[in-house]
């Protein structure tokens, strides 16, 4: 095998650094010079794009200083929001449970709807963690107030207030019958007492009609209350027990009459004996 001569084919030829001229570079500005990064200084030194690096640095620093988005949290305000506890009031309106003998299926249906509600309210938590978090939030004042309003069927959201304004008169008509009667009578008295105020026939008829409706509602309510009280008393107190006081009163009256008659007869007998005794003494 032939050896290769390293001097052949100029394998180890080195460049002639002694006779090679160095590249010319623009001088660097001093560290404290105000011209560093200046566009005029860059153009004067043959670097028209010298300010691009500074612009990119400024943009990157501005991007780093951007305000971070707040991470949503499962707190009391979110729990009492529209998708929170108020949504549970109407969640099971269209759900039909199978009843006795199908308790396991009904429980699965209940849990499935509750998991759906929890996912819509706060998707980042698993259902078990969500339950623990809600349990810890149960002592908050906002949550307690929301639960009380739900139990008392009071309006919570804006839609509840608008719904009550639209249909509150019909639903609570019987409960407000007495107040309506007093309010109508008071309004009529005030209108009559005000000087210079005249009511048209239509207004008077409307007032009379409203008063009549209020009176009818009040009578219906009183009749329902009396009927319910009678129904409650009748099974617990049979008719025989209810008639016992009357029978006792009649018996007592008869006994008093008999005692009075006996006393009168005794008195008359004593008077006759005294008269006979006086007559015998005179003779």
Swiss-Prot record:
GO terms for biological process: cell cycle phase transition; cell division; DNA replication checkpoint signaling; mitotic intra-S DNA damage checkpoint signaling; positive regulation of cell population proliferation; replication fork arrest; replication fork processing. Residues 1-68, 186-205, 217-238 are annotated as: Disordered. Its main location: cytoplasm. InterPro entries: Csm3, TIPIN/Csm3/Swi3. Disulfide bonds: none annotated. It comes from the Eukaryota. Residues 74-150 are annotated as: Interaction with TIMELESS. It is found in: Cytoplasm; Nucleus. One of its GO terms (molecular function) is DNA binding. Residues 15-24 have a biased composition (Acidic residues). Keywords: Cell cycle, Cell division, Cytoplasm, DNA damage, Mitosis, Nucleus. Transmembrane segments: none annotated. Plays an important role in the control of DNA replication and the maintenance of replication fork stability. Important for cell survival after DNA damage or replication stress. May be required for the replication checkpoint induced by hydroxyurea or ultraviolet light. Interacts with TIMELESS, which impairs TIMELESS self-association. Belongs to the CSM3 family. PANTHER family: TIMELESS INTERACTING-RELATED (PTHR13220), TIMELESS-INTERACTING PROTEIN (PTHR13220:SF11). This is TIMELESS-interacting protein.
């Amino acid at each position: 095998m032939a050896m290769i001569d390293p001097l052949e084919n100029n394998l180890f030829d080195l460049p002639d650094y002694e006779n090679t001229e160095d590249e010319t570079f623009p001088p660097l500005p001093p560290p404290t010079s105000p011209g560093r990064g200046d566009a005029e200084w860059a153009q004067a030194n043959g670097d028209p794009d010298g300010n691009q690096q500074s612009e990119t640095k400024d943009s990157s620093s501005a991007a780093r200083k951007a305000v971070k988005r707040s991470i949503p949290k499962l707190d009391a305000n979110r729990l009492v929001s529209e998708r929170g506890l108020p949504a549970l009031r109407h969640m099971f309106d269209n759900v039909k449970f199978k009843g006795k003998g199908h308790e396991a299926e009904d429980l699965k249906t209940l849990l499935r709807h509750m998991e759906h509600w929890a996912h819509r309210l706060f998707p980042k938590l698993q259902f078990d963690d969500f339950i623990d978090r809600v349990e810890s939030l149960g002592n908050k004042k906002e949550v307690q107030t929301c639960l009380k309003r739900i139990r008392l069927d009071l309006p919570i959201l804006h839609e509840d207030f608008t719904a009550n304004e639209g249909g509150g008169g019909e639903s609570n008509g019987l409960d407000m019958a007495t107040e309506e009667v007093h309010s109508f009578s008071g309004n009529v008295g005030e209108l009559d007492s005000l000087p210079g105020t005249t009511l048209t026939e239509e207004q008077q008829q409307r007032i009379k009609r409203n008063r009549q409706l209020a009176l009818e509602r009040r009578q219906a309510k009183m009749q329902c209350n009396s009927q319910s009280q009678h129904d409650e008393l009748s099974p617990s107190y049979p008719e025989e027990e209810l008639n016992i006081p009357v029978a006792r009163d009649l018996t007592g009256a008869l006994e008093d009459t008999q005692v009075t008659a006996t006393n009168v007869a005794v008195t008359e007998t004593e008077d006759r004996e005294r008269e006979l005794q006086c007559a015998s003494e005179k003779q």
